[in-house]
């Protein structure tokens, strides 16, 4: 299998899996949503490189490598927050963004009902959260 096709397939599977978990009730935190962005970009870049392999693949390969390394770093940071190695952003613990007016306060109070803290994993398998698995998979894919 061509590397760009394999990268596309793995990336699509990762995104389908996390959306499925969200569909069945595992609510992601804000950092979890941000961890999806490199995968979305990798899907686009690898899909384009399937059709224009000879023209852009050498450049695309390096950009995809950087996205996987960045994804691994971000996922490692998030996993460290979940394991309480360090603190996350202030919005991870409180669920409130910068409040500038009474209307902002009311919106934040209403949004807290669906708030998921970043320091608590909503799903663990074999002791690792999805951030931990994202770290491992991004690291492996960056080596690939």
Protein language model regions, located:
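Hydrophobic alpha-helical segments of small multi-pass membrane proteins
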Residues: 61-75, 93-101, 138
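Extracytosolic (periplasmic/ER-lumenal) interhelical loops and adjacent juxtamembrane/interface segments
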Residues: 83-129
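Juxtamembrane "helix-exit" motif on the non-cytosolic side of transmembrane helices
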Residues: 18-27, 78-82
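Helical transmembrane-bundle signal
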Residues: 8-18, 39-49, 68-78, 138-144
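Interfacial segments of alpha-helical transmembrane regions
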Residues: 1-9, 54-72, 143
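Membrane-interface loop-to-helix entry segments
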Residues: 31-41, 105-108, 112, 125-140
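Flexible coil/turn and secondary-structure edge motifs
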Residues: 49, 57-61, 80-86
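Non-cytosolic membrane-interface motifs at loop->transmembrane helix junctions
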Residues: 26-37, 90-93
């Amino acid at each position: 299998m061509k590397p760009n096709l394999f990268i596309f397939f793995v990336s699509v599977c990762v995104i389908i899996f996390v959306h499925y978990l969200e569909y069945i009730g595992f609510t992601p935190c804000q950092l979890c949503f941000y961890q999806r962005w490199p995968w979305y970009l990798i899907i686009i870049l690898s899909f384009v490189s399937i059709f224009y392999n000879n023209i852009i693949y050498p450049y695309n390969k390096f950009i995809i490598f950087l996205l996987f390394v960045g994804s691994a770093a971000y996922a490692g940071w998030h996993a460290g927050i979940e394991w309480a190695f360090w603190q996350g952003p202030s919005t991870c613990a409180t669920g409130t963004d910068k409040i500038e007016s009474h209307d902002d306060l009311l919106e934040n109070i209403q949004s807290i009902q669906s708030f998921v803290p970043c320091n608590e994993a909503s799903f663990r398998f074999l002791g690792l959260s999805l951030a931990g698995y994202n770290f491992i998979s991004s690291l492996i894919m960056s080596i690939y």
